[in-house]
Amino acid sequence: MTETSGRDTTAKGRPGSIWLRGTKKRAVKQPLSREQIVRAAVQLLDEGGVRNLRMRQLAESLNSAPMSLYWHVPTKDDLLELAVDEVFPDPPARSTPGDWSQDVKAGAEGLFDVLLEHAWMIELMGSHPPVGPRALAHTGAVIRILEEAGFVPPQLDSALSAIYYYTVGAALTEVSWQTMAQHSGENEEDWAQRLGPYVELTAAQDDAQSLSAYVKRSATSSTGQRFHDGLECMVHGMERMRSLPS
């Protein structure tokens, strides 16, 4: 299997995404399946992140030789793309008709929880657009919810973008704060409390007090609550936008 660090490593004229390529025909029964390989990769990614994922280590975890993985997953980039789709959440289920906002929030919260649980996804989604079957099913379900709620283009497209941009961006922010706190050897609240005085000294005088107060408030609120409150603000804005003429 070829390990690559860049994204565009395929032969000229060959689709860059593994989802856009055909599947090799299996001439003989293989001892491994692609599903087994991907699940094992997800476990290693959860333990050590993208930078520490090694194909040799993956093969050892499966009691196989590294080259035996090549038949199923040609490159490490392909494996990472498959891993992102493997852990993508189930599509949001539609609840009581007319309650579209609850369904939208359920879809966003499900994705947010998965991104926090598998923080490596956030890094990969910057170079591996989620276009696998599970990701498309999730997006398709959200589109149907919005359509049935009466959203039409261009408002529908704007609402869809807002949902995913906010969710991924919020998860990125939370993970970065948690990572910094872990690296400092402190919990998130203690680290944020120490950050307050630095903000007061560094920020523009007119902004320092407000920024410092915000940092301290953020340290005492839960990750889920911060996300939920922001999501509520966004959904209320979407409700107003829904009534605008297309």
Curated annotation (Swiss-Prot):
Q: What induces or represses its expression, per the UniProt entry?
A: Negatively autoregulated.
Q: MF terms per GO, please?
A: DNA-binding transcription factor activity; transcription cis-regulatory region binding
Residue ranges of domain HTH tetR-type in the record: 31-91
Regulation of its function: Activity is regulated by the effector molecule D-arabinose, which binds to AbrT and reduces its binding affinity to the abrT-SLCG_1980 intergenic region.
| A Gene Ontology BP annotation from the UniProt entry | negative regulation of DNA-templated transcription
Could you list this entry's UniProt keywords, alphabetically sorted: Activator, DNA-binding, Repressor, Transcription, Transcription regulation
Q: What InterPro entries does the record tag this protein with?
A: Homeodomain-like_sf, HTH-type_TetR-like_transc_reg, HTH_TetR, Repressor_TetR_C, Tet_transcr_reg_TetR, Tet_transcr_reg_TetR-rel_C_sf
Q: Which residues bind DNA?
A: 54-73
Q: Which domain of life is it from?
A: Bacteria
| KO phenotype (gene knockout) | Deletion of the gene results in increased lincomycin A (Lin-A) production, but delayed mycelium formation and sporulation on solid media.
Q: What does this protein do?
A: Transcriptional regulator that plays a pivotal role in regulating lincomycin production and morphological development in S.lincolnensis. Exhibits opposing regulatory effects, directly or indirectly repressing the expression of lincomycin biosynthetic (lin) cluster genes and directly activating the expression of the morphological developmental genes amfC, whiB and ftsZ. Binds to two motifs present in the bidirectional promoter between abrT and SLCG_1980, which encodes an arabinose efflux permease, leading to the repression of the genes.
Q: What is this protein called?
A: HTH-type transcriptional regulator AbrT
| Taxonomic source organism | Streptomyces lincolnensis
Protein's gene? abrT
